[in-house]
Amino acid sequence: MFTEYTGNRQFDLQLNRTFATILDRAGMETIAATTLPRLRTTSQITKLAQGLAERFSSEGDEDAAWRLHELAAFYLGADDPRKRRFIDAMSASFDEAHRSLALTRHAVPFGDGELTAMRWEADPTDRAQAPAGTPTTLIMMNGFDGYAEEIIDFASHFPTRPFDTIAFDGPGQGHTVLAGMPLEPPWERPTNAVLDYFGIESAAALGVSFGGYLVTRAAAYCPRISHVIAFDMMYRLLDGLTAPLPRPLRPIADAVVGNPRPAWLIDAALGTASRLSADLGWKLQQASHLTGLSRPSEVLRAFGDYTMEPLEGRITQPCLVFAGDADQYVPFERLGDVRRALENSASLDVRAFRHAQDPDMAQHCQIGDLDRAFAIMGDWLQAAPMKSLRNSIRG
């Protein structure tokens, strides 16, 4: 269930993302009812998450601790020494919490560095019972602000796991960007590096958040991807900056972000705006971290490369696309553009959710009901190989 704790959509998304799975712990209902609604600043969130992470770790509850360590790091800039300390603690707690599982860490050679990857072996019983044609490997792609640990943990929401699951931090993501490797547009390159490292000839691919765009880019140029899941859709990365604006203002904002000149004026305007909006301030901070660029005008130009427009007609795999009209990062009206970009897909299954009828599933990445979202994905992955109708559209 998605809970509006503070009334700040950005804060509420991150709080639901972290707290949804730990509300059953002692004292957490009280914190959710009395403490979370009073949060007003990113520093308050950091302080609360750090304190709770340390508490749960001292109690031996590492499954709760790693989630809270990640939240403690979330709003910190890359130059804050606490960020790396919290992320290291997150990784240590995650490994301790999952040491009984068939889950391993890997360093995938890429360029002059390495990509962080994690592999979770399929459940043998689930694999034996899966329909013929079910993918044997699922690649999970990170997004704008996650880490490989969180991405692979999403797989625990599948009702069954008949496939090996591999999550990775590509350039500009998670552990990889902390090591100094910035974001790059040709996402087929890190995807191919991961497939080569594990010796995989065919795999389904699932992109989370910004990964909903990245997975389509990879699929357009990587024929080893057999199935595509956009969880949820993302037609254009720049929409994340303009989506929160009132609809009449979006064309003006689009013109500015599409052509950020004069640079000095854009830099000054966004610098002022980011001080007035915690959401925009965080987005620009994170965007600078991902790209390695310091000026907002440079970031906007770089983000212009991340759009599905040039991919139109190139993606031929079966595709499953999620969309919600309460998504704070992706305008719902982009669904038509996404359909057009995927018009040559072997099949197109769109699951569109509206807040009035389905508020939990209408949020970004269906964060209000992950079990249901992953049940849909699991069913689709096991049924998609048997589809014969080209461009069958649902939703």
Predicted features by range, described:
Residues D80, R84-A130:
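N-terminal cap/lid segment of alpha/beta-hydrolase-fold proteins
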Residues F144-S156:
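The serine-hydrolase catalytic nucleophile loop
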Residues E150, G180-I200:
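Alpha/beta-hydrolase active-site loop
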Residues F154, Q317, P331-A341:
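Short alpha-helix in the alpha/beta-hydrolase fold that links the catalytic acid
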Residues F158-H175:
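Conserved alpha/beta-hydrolase
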Residues I315, V321-A323, D327:
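Short beta-strand/loop motif that positions the catalytic acidic residue
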Residues R340-M361:
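Catalytic histidine neighborhood in serine/cysteine hydrolases
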Residues A356-P359, Q363-G395:
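Catalytic active-site module of serine/aspartate enzymes centered on a nucleophile-bearing elbow/loop
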